């Protein structure tokens, strides 16, 4: 048993890898704050009002240094918080230790098993003193899914009887165990939730699907589609963190290689830019004719995965879809081709189909898959997020954009929840512009101010918003 789990049995309301890392984590948190002006200024603006006083936030989001600054912003504004990571490999152990030492219950360490992951996802809803979480801050939708699926299983256990992958095996087992102990565990907690703010594309897809089917049990704010999130975190964050992960894992020379990026949304665009910037020849696969045309107009060759599989050196999935790289693709790849994913879930690459072959672990989150003919394919982070599994994720500055949106969304939903139906919303344009404005001074950017005549000429307030909601940045 991991030492961190043993700690949790000694009446300590946290599970981390090593509390001796806390001081190191605190030093990095202090550095990160200097690069996260949006969060720091939001603390200053709202700390006297304490708008989150009474909020009990169940957080499921990568437990990194940057997330630590988010957590301490939420608590500075009055919230009580319990936190787990949304990925088994993404935790930075020194960050988790620092936040736990400061008094926030954290249940996360790098390299969790799937059983531990789902146990920790339950722990964020286990509030002391008979209280319950009333807000969810989610990344990928697992915390939201847990309560909704568990509540459904209370009425019909058959919904957790037929797992289709190892993730579902662990999830269903965990739900069944909790139902055996308390048959109303999930519905009791679900009834207290006022709303969720969702960080990423995959989780947002889940929310919109539930809304469409009339199954969304509480209001949701789609943080991902704030312009200052999707056009910054997804694009510029991935532009820096993808190659950081690949190079830390493999030390490969990117220049001269053929790299395939599956998906040319905001994440794929950032990935393609970074690989081309280091001298790779970049090919793109796409299902959407608009995105495919964008890629072609940027000078990328648009191909199919079937065409590229036996020709390219590096493969990156960035689609949010299922089995974008399948078994036959990997079987066709060159010896020592590098395969990785930067979408939220590990299902973009059909990793399960390769378990029949020999795996040779090179170092943490770097494996050789050895095919029967002796060919090896290098798989990074077991098909999970390469930038967080093999590196430390996005830089602090760009995460300040995303997490300032999260903070404002939590404030809005907690303080104004009665205004919202059980639907998915996005933050209003004036808040999107506010988030951007908070970050300009840090990078030496100075805004031009419209004159009254100029503002009148184009029909906007001189202080914004400057664009209509349908504007595409």
Curated annotation (Swiss-Prot):
Cofactor note: Binds 1 NAD(+) per subunit.
Main location: cytoplasm
Binding site for substrate: 64, 139, 199, 229, 233
Keyword tRNA-binding: no
GO molecular function, one term: adenosylhomocysteinase activity
GO biological process: L-homocysteine biosynthetic process; one-carbon metabolic process; S-adenosylmethionine cycle
Keywords: Cytoplasm, Hydrolase, NAD, One-carbon metabolism
PROSITE patterns referenced in this protein's UniProt entry, alphabetically: ADOHCYASE_1 (PS00738), ADOHCYASE_2 (PS00739)
Residues engaged in binding NAD(+): 200-202, 234, 263-268, 286, 321, 342-344, 387
EC number, UniProt record: 3.13.2.1
Cited InterPro entries: Adenosylhomocyst_ase-like_sf, Adenosylhomocysteinase-like, Ado_hCys_hydrolase_NAD-bd, NAD(P)-bd_dom_sf, S-Ado-L-homoCys_hydrolase_CS
NCBIfam families: ahcY (TIGR00936), PRK05476.2-3 (NF004005)
Family named by the database record: Belongs to the adenosylhomocysteinase family.
Job description of the protein: May play a key role in the regulation of the intracellular concentration of adenosylhomocysteine.
Protein name: Adenosylhomocysteinase
Organism in which the protein naturally occurs: Paraburkholderia phytofirmans (strain DSM 17436 / LMG 22146 / PsJN) (Burkholderia phytofirmans)
Upper taxonomic lineage: Bacteria, Pseudomonadati, Pseudomonadota, Betaproteobacteria, Burkholderiales
């Amino acid at each position: 048993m991991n030492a961190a789990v043993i700690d949790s049995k000694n009446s300590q309301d946290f599970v981390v890898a090593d509390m001796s890392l806390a001081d190191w984590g605190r030093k990095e948190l202090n550095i990160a704050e200097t690069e996260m002006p949006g969060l720091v200024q939001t603390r200053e603006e709202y700390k006297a009002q304490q708008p989150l006083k009474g909020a009990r936030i169940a957080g499921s989001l990568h437990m990194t240094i940057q997330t630590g600054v988010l957590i301490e912003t939420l608590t500075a504004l009055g919230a009580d918080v319990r936190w787990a990571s949304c990925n088994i490999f993404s935790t930075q152990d020194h960050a988790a230790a620092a936040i736990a030492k400061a008094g926030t219950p954290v249940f996360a360490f790098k390299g969790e098993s799937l059983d531990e992951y789902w146990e920790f996802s339950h722990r964020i809803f286990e509030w002391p003193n008979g209280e319950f979480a009333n807000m969810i801050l989610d990344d990928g939708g697992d915390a939201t899914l847990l309560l909704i699926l568990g509540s459904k299983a209370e009425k019909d256990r058959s919904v957790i009887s037929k797992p289709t992958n190892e993730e579902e095996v662990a999830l269903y087992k965990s739900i069944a165990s909790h139902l055996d102990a308390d048959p109303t565990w999930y519905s009791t907690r679900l009834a207290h939730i006022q709303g969720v703010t969702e960080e990423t594309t995959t989780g947002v897809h889940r929310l919109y699907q539930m809304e469409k089917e009339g199954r969304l049990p509480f209001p949701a704010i789609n943080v991902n589609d704030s312009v200052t999130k999707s056009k910054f975190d997804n694009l510029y964050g991935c532009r820096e963190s993808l190659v950081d992960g690949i190079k830390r894992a493999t030390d490969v020379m990117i220049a001269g290689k053929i790299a395939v990026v599956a998906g040319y949304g905001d994440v794929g665009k950032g990935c393609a830019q970074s690989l081309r910037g280091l001298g790779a020849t970049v090919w793109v696969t796409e299902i959407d004719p608009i995105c495919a045309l964008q890629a072609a107009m940027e000078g990328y060759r648009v191909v199919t995965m079937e065409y590229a599989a036996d020709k390219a050196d590096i493969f990156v999935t960035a689609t949010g879809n299922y089995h974008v790289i399948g078994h036959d693709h990997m079987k066709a790849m060159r010896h020592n081709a590098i395969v990785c994913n930067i979408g939220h879930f590990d299902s973009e690459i059909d990793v399960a189909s390769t378990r029949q072959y020999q795996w040779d672990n090179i170092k943490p989150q770097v494996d050789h898959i050895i095919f029967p003919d002796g060919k090896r394919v290098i798989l990074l982070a077991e098909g999970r997020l390469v930038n967080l599994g093999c590196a430390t994720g996005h830089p602090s500055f760009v995460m300040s954009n995303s997490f300032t949106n999260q903070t404002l969304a939590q404030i809005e939903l907690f303080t104004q929840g009665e205004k919202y139906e059980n639907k998915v919303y996005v933050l209003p344009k004036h808040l999107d512009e506010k988030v951007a404005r908070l970050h300009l001074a840090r990078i030496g950017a100075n805004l031009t101010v419209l004159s009254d005549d100029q503002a009148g000429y184009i029909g906007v307030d001189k202080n914004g918003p400057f664009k209509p909601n349908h504007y595409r940045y």
